[in-house]
């Protein structure tokens, strides 16, 4: 089991999954590098563990991931792995690279998402050694109805560092055991790697909402940033005739058949022109305000 680098792989429309994955990967690399960051030892003697980032938010690509420890993170939508994340993770292939799977949810529950993510990574050829659930600000969180607002926060990032350090210890222990074992013993060691993950098979049914973010034309300046940040390309700048029929007006619209309600456009619009009014915001604020904490399990 060769580990020459640590790669954070994530689908992260609103930035929370990416922030968590990179923090875990950084802590893992620092621990494997003797407590120093890659930058601190990049000019020193020896071969430091390299760090890579594979952000699949705006598009996936077929890629072989080998000789790497991967931190694979995805958001939870309706108790499942975000469908677009699942599609893009399936494009990755590995020949037994160890990984940690991380489900990021908005303080309600991750339901079957974590076990689904672990299954998905196994199908791609990865070897999950750890599974974690972390909390990120809910996509439906608003100023009026905050849900896990500004998470991951400093306490969450401390947990990321703790998780990353523990991952490094698990990898080092496994590498040591494998290096001292014969071929038959290695097979036994690998067969004994089991993860205790909450969730059900078959997974719960995913039920997407038909609603989609709208545009406040009084605030929108037609800058097109929402178009650029949409992970599924569902936002367009459309032209239509005005009331007099003499000129053409332009407006930003989403295709509800494609929109995944990730709310990247809502949170990313610098003018507050993208709005998603859903009764779930108030419901989640009312019922899911008690702070939940990250949890994880290890295969060793």
Give the positions of each predicted feature.
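FMN-binding flavodoxin-like domain, especially the glycine-rich phosphate-binding loop
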Residues: 1-20, 26-54, 59-210, 277-300
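Histidine- and/or cysteine-centered catalytic micro-motif in compact active-site loops
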Residues: 104, 218, 240
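Iron-sulfur cluster-binding cysteine motifs and their immediate structural context
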Residues: 215, 225-253, 264-281
């Amino acid at each position: 089991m060769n580990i020459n680098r640590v790669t954070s792989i994530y689908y992260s429309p609103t930035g929370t999954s990416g922030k968590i994955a990179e923090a875990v990967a950084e802590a893992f690399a620092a621990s494997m590098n003797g407590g120093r960051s890659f930058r601190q030892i990049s000019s020193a003697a020896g071969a430091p563990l390299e760090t890579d980032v594979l952000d699949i938010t705006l598009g996936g690509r077929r890629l072989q991931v080998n000789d790497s420890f991967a931190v694979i993170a995805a958001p939870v939508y309706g108790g499942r792995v975000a469908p677009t994340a699942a599609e893009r993770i399936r494009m990755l292939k590995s020949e037994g690279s160890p990984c940690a799977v991380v489900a990021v949810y908005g303080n309600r529950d991750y339901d079957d998402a974590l076990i689904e993510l672990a299954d998905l990574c196994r199908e791609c050829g990865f070897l999950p050694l750890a599974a974690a659930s972390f909390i990120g600000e809910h996509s439906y969180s608003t100023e009026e109805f905050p849900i896990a607002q500004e998470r991951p926060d400093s306490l969450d990032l401390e947990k990321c560092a703790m998780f990353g350090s523990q991952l490094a210890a698990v990898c080092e222990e496994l590498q040591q055991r494998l290096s001292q074992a014969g071929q038959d013993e290695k097979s036994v060691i690998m067969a004994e790697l089991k993860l205790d993950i909450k969730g059900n098979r078959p997974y719960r049914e995913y039920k997407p909402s038909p609603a989609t973010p709208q545009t406040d034309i009084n605030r929108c300046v037609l800058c097109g940033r929402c178009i650029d940040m949409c992970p599924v390309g569902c936002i367009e700048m459309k032209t239509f005739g005005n009331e007099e029929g003499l000129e053409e007006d332009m407006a930003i619209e989403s295709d509800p058949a494609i929109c995944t309600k990730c709310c990247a456009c809502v949170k990313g619009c610098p003018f507050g022109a993208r709005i998603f009014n859903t009764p779930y915001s108030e419901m989640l604020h009312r019922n899911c305000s008690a702070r939940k904490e990250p949890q994880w399990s290890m295969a060793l």
